[in-house]
């Protein structure tokens, strides 16, 4: 029989509490409220200061019988919620409103009227965690004691009056796939709520999110129609927003938003707290390229947060608020016949009192497209279909109708080509779609979202500067007829080029308004905020760590090693620190190659860097291969309570590493393979296996 070691004992202990934690839906490892998140609602929110947080009261005040709540991190769930609200109103006559989960309370949902319905569109973030705006909602319904205002207990089925619809957005490359919607749905069922239709699940990992959503909603509408006796009618476009051109204002008017994110930025007096709703315009202290090979660039940037009251911890994320490239702004304005009036000032107002205006107003067409709209995003088949009524001719209309109704044809002509909306329409006809109301574009195109990067510095070493390590995206994907260029990384490359003396930066042929609205970003500034992460070093620096981070997945581990080197320099005991790093070639894209030598001098034998170069030998070698080669080392460190970290690609690398680790544990301990897999799962639940991955 295999001898029990420390890891086995830890796993046995975890088995006792892990099962309880699992069946209480993750309460024990639920993400804490983000300390960097905004304490107030977003601009134009439905529940502004002084307004009610009682959703039942709000629905009664505004005459609504359907609320669509969303928990969204990148804007997709919010977009789906808006689409459901619009479709419910136009097709079925529902009186709909969209609601941000963090803007309302939940203690009175046991009093939700039986003649109304609530939708919950819930994204899962990271390893089964709620999105930032859904943390309190998640904790309320999945906690041990759900306390409603009426005092009703769970045994009394307090949500028996609540009719609800649920759809989740997840990624099957993560272990806890669609955990948010599954756990909330289970909690609602336990509390007696009545779900209408099935709880839908969209899979971003398989690239089928949009089609999953479209396939789910039709039977859902049928079930809801039967439950609420709804009558379907022909859907005719009814604007959610009223967009008017204001000839009395010019772009030079100080009240016109030209890209400023908030009113205080517009007025030239930005102030904290800086958050996901209020970025800090941060100076870039330093920028350089770690490597440049053909169309591949990798950037290192130092962003100063001095004087902002922003703080971060090693392992956190920084969010960069991008600007759309000039070529894409021009393309969009040309396709929709707005090129000649790009500087016209427009006012945007919600026709319904509950509608949240996603763009600061007044603004201009140019500013809206450049700074506020995700015009380079993948195209929704449902949105393309709505444009048929506004096509410039019958031939174009017929093509759009076919694209909207035939998912295989749409996949061939649009999805495979990686077209954004303007590119898709350009492929149909050279005629402008001038008849498309700008209100429809605001409704159908999501708000331009910040992009998140793992911080590659230690807050102990440089508390006022944040490092970013990012590969610039400019790739030709299989099937695409053009280069697909990253919105934010090319923007950052342009900033780097400008800072380093290029008077006319044009990364991969793109140009940007580098100085920002009204030159407020002059001097090389970029809007940022910080987001908390659970990806953290052990509190005890003597505890061993094993890190697996190929490519830019090494970013947070640079911060980890930087921190441990600083602690060692102060005389603190630092445990074994092992990094598995992979790249193509040692002389091409070995990130921070010289810097590791400095840390090696500081940490001595406590730092071990094991490399995998995939294109130097006859066989491709990846980090998971090196991990297997060093099975004994990995096993020995796990026996010493090592924490295991993975950062990088979720779809392939992270899955392979997870599999190999289970095999290592089983082989080194003489256990069945399934026991090794089980032990890795319990390492995850105990926090000794952590991931910071993306797909």
Swiss-Prot record:
User: What triggers or suppresses the expression of this protein?
Assistant: Expression is induced in the presence of benzoic acid. Expression regulation is particularly complex, involving regulatory promoter elements, differential promoter use and regulation at the post-transcriptional level.
Please report the stretch or stretches of sequence annotated as the FAD-binding FR-type domain. Answer: 277-538
Q: Where does FMN bind?
A: 72-77, 123-126, 169-178, 204
Q: EC? A: 1.6.2.4
Keywords annotated in UniProt? Cell membrane, Endoplasmic reticulum, FAD, Flavoprotein, FMN, Lipid biosynthesis, Lipid metabolism, Membrane, Mitochondrion, Mitochondrion outer membrane, NADP, Oxidoreductase, Steroid biosynthesis, Steroid metabolism, Sterol biosynthesis, Sterol metabolism, Transmembrane, Transmembrane helix
Q: Which residues are exposed on the Cytoplasmic face of the membrane?
A: 32-695
| Chain ranges of the Flavodoxin-like domain | 66-221
Q: What class of enzyme is it?
A: oxidoreductase
Major site of localization recorded for this protein: endoplasmic reticulum
The record lists the membrane-crossing segments as 9-31
Where in the cell is the protein located? Endoplasmic reticulum membrane; Mitochondrion outer membrane; Cell membrane
Catalysed conversion reaction: 2 oxidized [cytochrome P450] + NADPH = 2 reduced [cytochrome P450] + NADP(+) + H(+)
Query: Which stretches are Lumenal in the membrane topology?
Result: 1-8
Q: Which GO terms describe its molecular function?
A: flavin adenine dinucleotide binding; FMN binding; NADP binding; NADPH-hemoprotein reductase activity
State the function annotated in the UniProt record.
This enzyme is required for electron transfer from NADP to cytochrome P450 in microsomes. It can also provide electron transfer to heme oxygenase and cytochrome B5. Involved in ergosterol biosynthesis.
What is this protein's name?
NADPH--cytochrome P450 reductase
Q: Whose protein is this, by species?
A: Aspergillus niger (strain ATCC MYA-4892 / CBS 513.88 / FGSC A1513)
Q: Gene that codes for this?
A: cprA
